[in-house]
């Protein structure tokens, strides 16, 4: 079989202007980037206001493993098959961060014959949205440092006299706004800034990866440019010496940050291998932020297509949960059905059983033990009131005996249906049965529900999410978290939803607890207000906001060939 890159290069692409017109966009609503990409102007939202919406399908997965479950492959494959069946369909996915592209995970365009193309353009830069987020974020960091420098240099009276601005009295130890870069670089996690006689004052800071920026979450959750401006103004960048929040609006930098992101608020239109439209927009990580593509892209797609297929990051305890309790809660966009991706490899890896057997080899004992993880994720999706279709992403090494056993086992669960998917090797033909079953699932009456109401106490939200969302026995708040809980409630933020920042490698907070852990207590060490994004992040366990590169990073395989073409992506 050809490599992902070879398949992408041999694809026969429609001119993006033609594809956009067929999708329902007007010429003036597309800002073309060559023949393969186009920004979609938000004036289309005004034109389509009041249009009936299509069916929204959310793709999720079992607990992720290093072997890859194929969630994006399934998202794109399902989209291609729905199109092949004669439906008007659109995929909505996140823009890949270059950190994972050059790290371990690789690209995020799908794979095989279920790809968004050209895949190298999607995985590297696209139309520059992540760079815009980085620049806007770092302007905020520079504005804080500059304001602190001038206030301390001049003192309150002279600063206000010379600048005409209010004295903010920023506490150097209260600056919470790091800088960002779109790479994995562990040595930047903790740094000293402001060193040198005329560069201070010095204070401890650090870098996060751009996908972890609250600006990225804001981009993904905003309804339009005006909403994004309001949200950016609410960003808490620092604390003053009285412990009060200093916002981007108070610092006077929110307008400029928004201006940098004025084009980033527009989704990018590309296409799948069989010419289905795909909107790529925003890229928040699911272990740190809410892990879903943008509300704007979904809103546009739902008014132009019969079916919209999107995905949440990692397993159903991560991106799917946050899709429901954060994205759907804020946007009002309600899914009609869910697709839960699994593989034989994933279930064996999630079995918790030690084995010398190669993960590709038949191992009925590990498969049966790992099935509990799949069943847990099925029940997790069902508790949100959605019909869930299990998609078994087939690998070449899979045996018919194990696949048949798994299909039969799923029939005894709460899943609406179960189908094999061979979209990776067969493209649109490989997910036809899956598409037909998903269509039937979307015809079921909607019973979508959230896990907790807005008016629930903040501590009760944390407990509910731990117990119902992860199967924990309860939570344990650190002394710091208890104090922050009281402060957030007193300041009137208890109505916000909770975003758990935890490992994706286990349903629990501990990556070593495989399968379906029980009886564990979730340790909440810190609560962080994300006033602009509109949620409170609970830091659980040891979650890094700046990844590091591994021993053999992905960049080792990436180069340019003699024809000037990029090689090694995928």
From Swiss-Prot:
InterPro entries: Formate_THF_ligase (IPR000559), Formate_THF_ligase_CS (IPR020628), P-loop_NTPase (IPR027417). ATP binds at residues 65-72. Gene3D superfamilies: Domain 2, N(10)-formyltetrahydrofolate synthetase (3.30.1510.10), Formyltetrahydrofolate synthetase, domain 3 (3.10.410.10), P-loop containing nucleotide triphosphate hydrolases (3.40.50.300). GO terms for biological process: tetrahydrofolate interconversion. Pathway: One-carbon metabolism; tetrahydrofolate interconversion. Keywords: ATP-binding, Ligase, Nucleotide-binding, One-carbon metabolism. It comes from the Bacteria. Coiled coil: none annotated. It is an enzyme of class 6 (ligase). GO terms for molecular function: ATP binding; formate-tetrahydrofolate ligase activity. It catalyses: (6S)-5,6,7,8-tetrahydrofolate + formate + ATP = (6R)-10-formyltetrahydrofolate + ADP + phosphate. Its EC number is 6.3.4.3. Signal peptide: none annotated. It holds the Pfam family FTHFS. PROSITE patterns: FTHFS_1 (PS00721). Belongs to the formate--tetrahydrofolate ligase family. This is Formate--tetrahydrofolate ligase.
């Amino acid at each position: 079989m050809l490599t992902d890159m070879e398949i992408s290069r041999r694809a026969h692409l429609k001119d993006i202007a033609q594809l956009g017109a067929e999708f329902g966009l007007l010429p003036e609503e597309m800002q073309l980037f060559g023949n393969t990409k186009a920004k979609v102007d938000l004036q289309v939202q005004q034109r389509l206001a009041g249009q009936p919406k299509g069916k929204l399908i959310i793709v999720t997965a079992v607990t992720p493993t290093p072997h890859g479950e194929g969630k994006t492959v399934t998202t794109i494959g399902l989209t291609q098959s729905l199109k092949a069946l004669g439906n008007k369909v659109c995929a909505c996915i996140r823009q890949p961060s270059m950190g994972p592209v050059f790290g371990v995970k690789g690209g995020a365009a799908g794979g095989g014959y279920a790809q968004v193309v050209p895949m190298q353009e999607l995985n590297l830069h696209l139309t520059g949205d992540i760079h815009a987020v980085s620049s806007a974020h770092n302007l905020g960091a520079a504005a804080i440092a500059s304001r602190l420098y001038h206030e301390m240099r001049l003192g309150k009276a002279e600063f206000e006299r010379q600048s005409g601005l209010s004295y903010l009295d920023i506490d150097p130890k209260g600056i919470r706004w790091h800088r960002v870069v779109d790479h994995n670089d562990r040595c930047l996690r903790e740094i000293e800034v402001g060193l040198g006689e005329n560069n201070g004052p010095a204070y401890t800071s650090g870098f996060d990866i751009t996908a972890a920026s609250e600006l990225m979450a804001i981009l993904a959750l905003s309804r339009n440019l005006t909403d994004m401006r309001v949200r950016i103004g609410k960003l808490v960048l620092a604390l003053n010496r009285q412990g009060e929040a200093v916002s981007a609006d108070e610092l006077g930098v929110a307008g400029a940050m928004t201006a940098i992101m004025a084009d980033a608020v527009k989704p990018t239109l590309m296409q799948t291998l069989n010419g289905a439209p795909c909107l790529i927009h925003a890229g928040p990580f699911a272990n740190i932020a809410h892990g879903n593509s943008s509300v704007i892209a979904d809103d546009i797609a739902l008014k132009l297509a019969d079916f919209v297929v999107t995905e949440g990051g990692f397993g159903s305890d991560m991106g799917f949960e946050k899709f429901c309790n954060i994205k759907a809660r804020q946007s009002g966009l309600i899914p009609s059905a869910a697709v839960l991706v699994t593989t034989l490899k994933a279930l064996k890896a999630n079995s918790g059983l030690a084995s010398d057997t190669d993960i590709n080899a038949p191992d009925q004992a590990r498969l049966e033990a790992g099935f509990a993880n799949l069943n847990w994720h099925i029940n997790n999706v069902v508790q949100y009131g959605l019909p869930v279709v299990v998609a078994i992403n087939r690998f070449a090494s899979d045996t018919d005996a194990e696949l048949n056993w798994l299909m039969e086992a799923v029939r005894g669960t709460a899943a609406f249906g179960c189908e094999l998917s061979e979209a990776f090797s067969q493209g649109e033909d490989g997910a036809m049965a899956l598409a037909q079953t998903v269509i039937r699932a979307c015809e079921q009456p909607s019973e979508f529900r959230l896990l907790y109401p807005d008016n629930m106490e903040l501590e009760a939200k944390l407990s509910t999410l731990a117990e119902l969302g992860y199967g924990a026995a309860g939570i344990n708040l650190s002394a710091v978290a208890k104090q922050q809980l009281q402060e957030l409630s007193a300041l009137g933020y208890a109505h916000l939803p909770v975003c758990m920042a935890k490992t994706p490698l286990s349903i629990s907070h501990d990556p070593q607890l495989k399968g379906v852990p029980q009886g564990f207590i979730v340790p909440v060490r810190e609560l962080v207000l994300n006033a602009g994004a509109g949620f409170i992040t609970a830091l659980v366990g040891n979650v890094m906001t700046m990844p590091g590169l591994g021993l053999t990073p992905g960049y080792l395989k990436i180069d340019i060939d003699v024809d000037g073409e990029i090689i090694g992506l995928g």
